[in-house]
């Protein structure tokens, strides 16, 4: 009987140790990237009025409606990009999004929206392979030749976007939108929750030095910047 109890105690201790190790690993796996992105972006997130001057507003893509119009989230990002251009904080806008399907084209929708709002057409450059934040940041440097950017997205995404760009060598700061939160608090909270998993993916991309779709060097942004 004593031996059985001892065996059971040993089994429970082993199980408890395994559970604690698993919890600890989960905390490090999830918590580590979140802490990293906050540290990398600390003091680098601004409003339009107090943002430092950079060459380019890098506006990250989001959903486009079936009509071809930017979703409210994307429109809010584009409005910030235009405000930065009009305030003289940037000299050009790089719209970077998904064009991976025949009838879905974020960059063209973004560019049309900005030009219709008064942005000079020659100052709005489209990146058609910005399939995620990591790709958009890397392509801004490798394909479009700029490292001086203000990243524009929603505020819950901003720390990761700035951290990713800076980890890839860009002199990046960020300006974020939170006006769309009023449209649906649940949608906003879901976006915040998704950022936890996205932070882990960011860490994997950076550690593994993932190579997104690149291609030949583009000169359209050089022309927009007059260089």
Report the location of each language-model feature.
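A general structural signal for short secondary-structure boundary/capping elements
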Residues: 100-106, 173, 196-203, 219-224
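N-terminal type II signal-anchor transmembrane helix
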Residues: 3-49
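A general, composition-driven signal for non-globular sequence regions
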Residues: 2-10, 71, 148, 195
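Short linear elements at protein peripheries
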Residues: 209-227
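A structural signal for short, hydrophobic/glycine-enriched beta-strand patches
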Residues: 35-193
């Amino acid at each position: 009987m004593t031996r059985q109890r001892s065996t059971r105690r040993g089994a429970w201790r082993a199980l408890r140790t395994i559970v604690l190790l698993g919890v600890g690993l989960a905390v490090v796996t999830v918590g580590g990237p979140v802490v990293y992105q906050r540290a990398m972006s600390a003091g680098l997130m601004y409003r339009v009025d107090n943002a430092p001057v950079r060459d380019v507003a890098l506006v990250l893509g989001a959903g486009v409606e079936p009509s071809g119009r930017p979703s409210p989230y994307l429109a809010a990002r584009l409005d910030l990009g235009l405000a930065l251009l009009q305030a003289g904080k940037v000299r050009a806008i790089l719209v970077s999004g998904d064009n991976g399907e025949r009838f879905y084209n974020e960059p063209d929708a973004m560019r049309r929206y900005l030009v219709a709002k008064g942005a000079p057409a020659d100052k709005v450059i489209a990146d058609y392979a910005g399939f995620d934040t990591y790709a958009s940041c890397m392509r801004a440097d490798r394909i479009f030749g700029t490292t001086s950017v203000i990243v524009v997205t929603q505020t819950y995404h901003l720390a990761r976007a700035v951290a990713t760009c800076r980890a890839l060598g860009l002199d990046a700061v960020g300006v974020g939108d939170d006006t769309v939160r009023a449209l649906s608090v649940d949608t906003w909270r879901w976006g915040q929750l998704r950022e936890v998993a996205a932070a882990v993916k960011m860490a994997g991309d950076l550690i593994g030095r993932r190579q997104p779709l690149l291609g030949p060097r583009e000169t359209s942004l050089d022309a927009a910047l007059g260089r």
